[in-house]
From Swiss-Prot:
The chain crosses the membrane at residues 11-31, 35-55, 76-96, 108-128, 139-159, 175-195. Belongs to the NqrDE/RnfAE family. It is a multi-pass membrane protein. It catalyses: a ubiquinone + n Na(+)(in) + NADH + H(+) = a ubiquinol + n Na(+)(out) + NAD(+). GO terms for molecular function: oxidoreductase activity, acting on NAD(P)H, quinone or similar compound as acceptor. Its EC number is 7.2.1.1. It is an enzyme of class 7 (translocase). It comes from the Bacteria. This is Na(+)-translocating NADH-quinone reductase subunit E.
Length: 197
């Protein structure tokens, strides 16, 4: 149990997808203007990561040498299968949001289908394969990585909302000051890097 707790804390804080590995920055910067929209996208990313990492772990275990038949190694197909599973989960999420939460579906706009090619999603799945997590570890890691990404985007959205009323220089208004805020947040999260779990 302690191992899973340390893996969860590590994936949320120490190895944060957005602020430590700088993955998923396109949607991270573009959707961080309002806390409500950022929260909705964060929940969507938690859903996709929480399901795609363990599902891809099961698929990857079938691709390994000798899993299907002796002497058959299909690990060269891992990237295409990872992308296929991620795309299917995002399609399911998109249909669900369109039917049951149309306000969030419209607010996310083009960024919802872009979760399919969000490098944070693919990065977490690739880390799972590289680190050879078992199914339980992949569930914890997927949920933790999604929660960490959501924590980062909601925090940045909160800062961005407050900065609308600040007296920032004209040249830094908008994306410029957002980059600075994201950089300062990343520096703050670097303080977790020395923690050994």
């Amino acid at each position: 149990m302690e191992h899973y707790l340390s893996l969860f804390i590590k994936s949320v804080f120490i190895e944060n997808m957005a602020l430590s590995f700088f993955l998923g920055m396109c949607t991270f910067l573009a959707v961080s203007k309002k806390v409500s929209t950022a929260f909705g996208l964060g929940v969507a990313v938690i859903f996709v990561l929480g399901l795609s990492v363990p599902v891809n772990q099961l698929v990857y275990s079938l691709l390994k040498d000798g899993a299907i038949a002796e002497g058959v190694d299909l690990t060269f197909l891992k990237f295409i299968t990872f992308i296929g599973v991620i795309a299917a989960l995002v399609q399911i999420l998109e249909m669900f949001l369109d039917k049951f939460v149309p306000a969030l579906y419209n607010a996310l706009g083009i960024y919802l289908p872009l979760i399919t090619v969000n490098c944070a999603i693919f990065g977490a799945v690739s880390f799972m394969a590289q680190r050879e997590y078992n199914f339980g570890e992949s569930v914890v890691y997927g949920f933790g990585a999604g929660l960490g990404w959501m924590l980062a985007i909601v925090a940045l959205a909160g800062i961005t909302e407050k900065m609308k009323y600040s007296d920032a220089p004209k040249g830094l208004k908008g994306l410029g000051i957002t980059f600075i805020a994201a950089g300062l947040m990343a520096m703050a999260f670097m303080s977790f890097s020395g923690i050994q779990l």
